[in-house]
Amino acid sequence: MAPTTRTCSFVLALSLLAASPAGAKRTPAFELTGPATFVGARAAALDGDLRRSALLYAALAEQEPGSTVIAGRAISAAIASGDTKLALRLAAKRPISELEVDAKLLLAGEELRRGKEGKASAILRGQTGGGVDLGFLAPLVEAWRRAEKGDASAIGTLSEVPAGSAVAPYLSEHRALMLLKLGKPVEAEPIARRAIAAAGRREARVRIALADGFMRNRDRERALAMLEGREVSLFRARQLLQSGRRPGAGIDNAADGFAELLLALSLDLARADVRSLPLVMIQVARHASPDAPQAPVLLGSFLGSNERPDEALVVLRGVGDDNLFSPEAQDTEIRTLLRVDRDQEALARALAFAAAPDAQADDQARVADVLAEMGRHVDAADALGRALAMVEAGGPGPERWVLNLLRGGELEQAERWAEAKVALEAALAQAPENPLVLNYLGYAKLERGENLDRAEQLIAKASALAPDNASITDSLGWAQFKRGRVEQAIATLQQAAAKDPSQAEIQEHLGDALYTVGRKFEARHAWNAALITAEDEVKERIESKLEAGLTPANAAP
C-alpha cells in the first residue's frame, strides 16, 4: 500500500460526506530499529492488530519527530484501535493545521467532552491536512452549544447546514431534540415524528432518545407515544417509563449530538463500503460521549464484519444488561460467531440468552437462526414456535406473520410440507398483502405441483405488489413456464434477469425456458451466468445441462 493511500481514502470518504445527499491483542516486545519498526507497524496494521501498529508507529514518531507521515499513521492507528489517549498525546505534538481528518475529529470530540463547544467548532472549521473541509459538521455543534445555553436561536443555526450535506438527513431528529432541550415538547412532537419516519435502521435509537427528552420535560404521554414498536429495546424503555423512570440514552448536549451524528454517518459509510472512516467515527463517538449506548454495538458489528472477530467479541460481551441495546449486542455476537464458523459456540451462547429469566421471543428467534445455519431445520422450527407462543401471549418480538413465515420455511426445508403449509397459510392470513408471504407460499406450491391455479394467483399478486423484486418476478416467470406458456415465461424471466443478473436461480430458469423453445445458444449463455454464483449442488445440475442439454433429470425444480 502506498504511503498516501490511507490519506486519500479519508479525503474521498469525507468529500463524499460533505457533498452527499442523504479487546486489544497483547502487544509483544519489539526493538526500535527504524525501517524494521516501520515495516512491523505496517504489517501489524494489515494483520488487523491496530494496537500494536499504533505503538510501533508511536515509537517511530519519537525517533523521527519531524515526520508528518509517521505521526499521521501513529495517530490514525491509535484512534482506530480505540487508544484515544495515545492519539491525543501524539496529536498534541503536531501543529493542528498538519493534522489529518481523523485527528481533527478526535480533537473536536475531546473539546466537546470537556464542554468546550466553541473550540470544537473552531477545529472543525479550520483547515485540515489533506485539504478536507470538516466545516459541514460545525453548524450542528454550534446549534447544540446554543441549545445548551437555552438560546432559542439554536434552531435557526441548523439552517446553515446545506441541503445537500450528509448532515441534512439528520436535522429533524436534532431539531426535535434541541426543542426538547429548550423545554418545548409540543413544538417538538411533529418534528420528532418526521425524524422517526426517516430514521431507517436507527428507528429504535431515535425513538428512545426522543422519549427520554419528552420525559425530561415531564411529558409522559408523548414519551410513551415515541416508544411504539415491537423491538425489545423499545419494550424495555416502555417498562422504565411505566415505572416512572426515564429510559436514559438521551441526547441533550453537544457531545452527545456530535457522537450520535458520527455514529449515523458511520452507518452510511459502511453501507457504501468505505472501510477505514466508519471505524474512526465510531471510536471518536465513543470518546466524545462514553455513554453513547449504541456505540459499542456498532463497533462490535464493524470489527466482526471486517475479520476481527476476537476483538468484536470482547467489545460485544462488554455491553451490560442495563444497556437498552444489549439484545442488539447479543444478535451481533451470534452473527460474528457464525461468520467464522464457530457454530457450536454460537448455539451455546444463544441458548444461554434464551434461558435468561427475562428472555423474550427474539431470544428464541436467535436460537432458530443458529439452528437453521447448522441445518437443524426441525429444531429451528421448534424454536420459532416457542417465539410465536411468547408473542401471542403479549410479549415483544417480531410480528406473528414473520415468525409463521420463518417457521414455515424451516419446516419446508425439513421436508415436512404438511406442517409447513399450515404455518405459511397462517402467515398469509395475518399478512394477506405481503408480497414475501404471497411469493413464498405460491412458489412452494408451484414446486410441488399443488393447486397450480392458486399458486400462480398468489405469485401474480406478489409481483403486482412488488414489481421491482427480481426474485418475485422470477417466480412469476417460472409459474408461467410450468403452466406451459413458455414465450410469456421467457419475457418475464428476462425481466427478472435484468433486475438482478447475479441470481443463479433466475439465470437457470431462463436457460431452461430458452432451451425448451430451441434457443440453445442463449440457454447456454444463461446457464453459464448461473454457474458464477450457484451453490455446489446447483452447479452440478447446471454443468450437466451444459454437457448434455436439458433433460427431465437435470431440469430446475
Regions found by a protein language model. Give the residues of each.
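Residue-level recognition of tetratricopeptide repeat
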Residues: 42, 76, 109, 142-144, ...
